[in-house]
A protein has these predicted regions:
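Glycine-rich phosphate-binding loops of nucleotide-dependent enzymes
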Residues: 2-262
Length: 262
């Protein structure tokens, strides 16, 4: 019987190594390291002021790190702007979604990169065709791509924002409180969308305070407290009580998590 050497683990889509951010004498994030894998949903959790927004702003190119390194496919990268991060395949869907109310679904998907014919004529037919295709790929049921966004529900708007990231080939999608202010049915649709992103091999970083949502779709939970990463948990091996204890700073819960990690 021939023995084959074990294959090396796949290179993570995104890796943060010792990332820190200082604002004057205030340390917003301190020595945070993490890895995000393709086809995996990672929940980023923490109380207000834990450092979640700072971490997202650095990964999405809004704020440069004070120290540490961001690696994409194992290679160090530096983002001078959000456009740099988007070109590298990192998309962030913020709570405001950045959609234009009076533009159609298709126009919002192609916002800023509209295809043209003859060098100057907007190719609306192509926009509508490709918009319908990407929505079908995501198994999203929406009105026709010519429909203005103002007529869409909250969950449908979230779907348009996510579809835009897929259309532009994003390999990592950061979702900031995607179900905030949504009803039960709309929340279920957004969670289905996250599952579909995972199925298609996209890495998803989910920022949420909703533990039900986290336990429904996440594979891992990264927990920040006072700017530091204090836990990296397998969702299948943890509980709501443990996560809440870590978020609020329970010493006994933190000790248990550290013992298990060791």
């Amino acid at each position: 019987m021939r023995c084959h050497p074990a294959l090396p683990p796949p290179v993570p889509v995104l890796e943060l190594a010792g990332l820190s951010r200082h604002f004057g004498h205030v340390t917003a994030l301190a020595d945070v390291s993490l890895q995000l894998a393709a086809g995996q949903v990672t929940a980023l959790l923490g109380d207000n002021g834990a450092g979640k927004s700072t971490l997202i702003s650095m990964v999405s190119g809004v704020t440069p790190p004070s120290a540490g390194e961001i690696r994409l496919d194992g290679r160090p990268v530096r983002f001078a702007s959000p456009a740099d991060a988007r070109r590298a395949g990192i998309a962030t869907v913020f709570q405001n979604l950045s959609l234009v109310e009076d533009r159609s679904i298709a126009e919002n998907l192609f916002l800023g990169c509209e295809p043209v014919r003859f060098g100057f004529v907007l190719d609306r037919r192509r926009m509508n065709r490709e918009a319908e295709a990407v929505l079908e790929r995501l198994k999203v049921n929406l009105p026709p791509a010519t429909t203005a966004v103002r007529y869409l529900s909250g969950g449908q708007r979230q779907a348009v924002a996510v579809a835009r990231t897929v259309l532009h080939g994003s390999r990592l999608v950061i979702m900031d409180e995607p179900t905030a202010a949504l009803g039960v049915r709309e929340t279920a649709r957004v969670l289905d969308l996250i599952r579909e992103l995972r199925r298609q091999g996209t890495a998803v970083l989910l920022v949420s305070h909703n533990m039900d949502n986290v336990f429904e779709v996440a594979d891992r939970a990264l927990i920040l407290r006072l700017g530091r990463k204090i836990a990296d948990l397998d969702i299948a091996r943890t509980s709501r009580a443990e996560i809440v204890g870590l978020v609020v700073g329970s010493a006994s819960t933190r000790a248990t998590a550290q013992e298990r990690a060791a």
